[in-house]
Amino acid sequence: MRVKEQLLTLRAYVPGKNIEEVKREYGLSKIVKLASNENPFGCSARVTEALTSLASQYALYPDGHAFELRTQVAKHLGVKAEQLLFGSGLDEVIQMISRALLHEGTNVVMANPTFSQYHHHAVIEGAEVREVSLKDGIHDLDAMLQQVDDQTKIVWICNPNNPTGTYVEKQKLLSFLESVPKSALVIMDEAYYEYAGAEDYPQTLPLLEKYENLMVLRTFSKAYGLAAFRIGYAVGNTELIGQLEVARLPFNTSTVAQSVALAALEDQAFLQECVKKNEEGLHQYYAFCKEYNVFYYPSQTNFIFLKLGIPGNEAFERLMKKGYIVRSGAAFGIDDGIRITVGLKEENDEIIELLKELVNEQVQKEETYS
């Protein structure tokens, strides 16, 4: 029995190593995971409270339409409930969109590097993938526009971008939306939206009324700290969202996920405190990079991408042996970089000291050979 030919060219998604795996492999008792862009501050206390009230519902199917969560998210965003499509994390939302729109003979346009699942699901559906290299770490919208044609079904824009943490400015996005054919769906993946504080970061929801070929993706996995529960959503025009509902599994978001997302949404004070502490953490890394002349991309997310002057895989291994899990840039095609999730203040302090050691060792090597 053979699967689709295109599946033979792909690899299953490989997440960052988990804590127990690293403990076993390196014989360590303490592990700090800064690899998957999870919220180090956890989630709102209201989530724990919500969980205690769910025991009587475990044997029942969830609300397939996610009515209560849908109603409150719509109110929070200022959109219609019919504009929302919920999924088991944004991974499933991306899968649903790809399944509904793509087939052999169509194409998608995206940056490189960016979130890998856009490429993954396009290949599964038999679509051509047109990748455009980042320009100074940022989506090159002009070059991406040149790749769009009549067969382009989706243009993916990860904003802020994973893995670089950079963002597309408002005016550049508006210019792109004015120029791109209306037959191409422009999807703004805003998984890290809550962390983006730049003045010229585009607010896309108000643009949905003008641009019917625009769609916005957001998640509860990152700033809300609910990665374990898997819930994300798309916001778009009601007609397209209604059509995409056909591709959604009947009970794709659990009662537990819906309940905790609703609880987290209600605690905006906790969210804002997390965002504030994350900004402080980023500045810890900025100070290190400036003092040690380390290249980095200014970030609008809860992670930072930097280059230490050594291969990313080497930095990854050496940090892991010390109990710190990060992501090697090699996973994204940037062999000389690493991506580090912003952690608690003390975690940032500790790993920065290790980064200093790596940089100093490299400087000494270069001086020896010069």
From Swiss-Prot:
EC number(s) from the headed UniProt entry: 2.6.1.9
Keywords: Amino-acid biosynthesis, Aminotransferase, Histidine biosynthesis, Pyridoxal phosphate, Transferase
Domain of life: Bacteria
Swiss-Prot/TrEMBL GO biological process terms: L-histidine biosynthetic process
Pfam families the UniProt entry points to: Aminotran_1_2
Residues carrying N6-(pyridoxal phosphate)lysine: K222
Catalysed conversion reaction: L-histidinol phosphate + 2-oxoglutarate = 3-(imidazol-4-yl)-2-oxopropyl phosphate + L-glutamate
Known cofactor(s): pyridoxal 5'-phosphate
GO molecular function, one term: pyridoxal phosphate binding
Pathway(s) served: Amino-acid biosynthesis; L-histidine biosynthesis; L-histidine from 5-phospho-alpha-D-ribose 1-diphosphate: step 7/9
Signal peptide span: none
Family: Belongs to the class-II pyridoxal-phosphate-dependent aminotransferase family. Histidinol-phosphate aminotransferase subfamily.
PANTHER family registered for this protein in UniProt: HISTIDINOL-PHOSPHATE AMINOTRANSFERASE, HISTIDINOL-PHOSPHATE AMINOTRANSFERASE 2
Assembly and oligomerization: Homodimer.
Name of this chain's protein: Histidinol-phosphate aminotransferase 1
Taxonomic classification: Bacteria, Bacillati, Bacillota, Bacilli, Bacillales
Gene: hisC1
